[in-house]
Amino acid sequence: MQVIFLNDVRGKGKRGQIKNVPDGYAQNFLIKKGLAKEATKAAINTLKAEQKSEAARAAEELAEAKQVKTVLEADETVVELKAKAGTDGRLFGSIPSKQIATALADQYQVKLDKRKIELPEPIRVLGYTNVPVKLHPEVTAKIRVHVVEK
């Protein structure tokens, strides 16, 4: 019997996959537990339409991430932050990714989740720092952060 998997089933199939399985296994376990449904023509067509729309949405997200990358990596894009510092150029405290995300939204109207800013450790010195930003699993940008004394 052909079934469409609704969830991942270990050792049998992944979500959205169409596979042949024994009739008893399909009816008594997979379909009964809601892990799969029978692969009728209508169900297969619905699945293909869903996969097509998912692919289009993923392509749109990728294009949007690339557009944001061009804005962030432009030469004139420098995120300015002010902080108190000592005489040796070290900050009193630090600048975390949340503060960078807030400044980016204020200065360039680019809203980013602070978790996308891959700051290995908070910035603790004055000057310019290149900070990687993971916009999409396939797109990573670098933004320049300039920390000046208050």
UniProtKB/Swiss-Prot annotation:
Keyword Ribonucleoprotein among record annotations: yes
One BP term from GO: translation
InterPro entries registered for this protein in UniProt: Ribosomal_bL9, Ribosomal_bL9/RNase_H1_N, Ribosomal_bL9_bac/chp, Ribosomal_bL9_C, Ribosomal_bL9_C_sf, Ribosomal_bL9_N, Ribosomal_bL9_N_sf
GO annotation, cellular component aspect: ribonucleoprotein complex; ribosome
Cited PROSITE patterns: RIBOSOMAL_L9 (PS00651)
Molecular function via GO: rRNA binding; structural constituent of ribosome
Keywords: Ribonucleoprotein, Ribosomal protein, RNA-binding, rRNA-binding
Superkingdom of this protein's organism: Bacteria
HAMAP family: Ribosomal_bL9 (MF_00503)
Family: Belongs to the bacterial ribosomal protein bL9 family.
Summary of the function given for this chain in its UniProt record: Binds to the 23S rRNA.
This protein's name: Large ribosomal subunit protein bL9
Lineage: Bacteria, Bacillati, Bacillota, Bacilli, Lactobacillales
Gene designation per UniProt: rplI
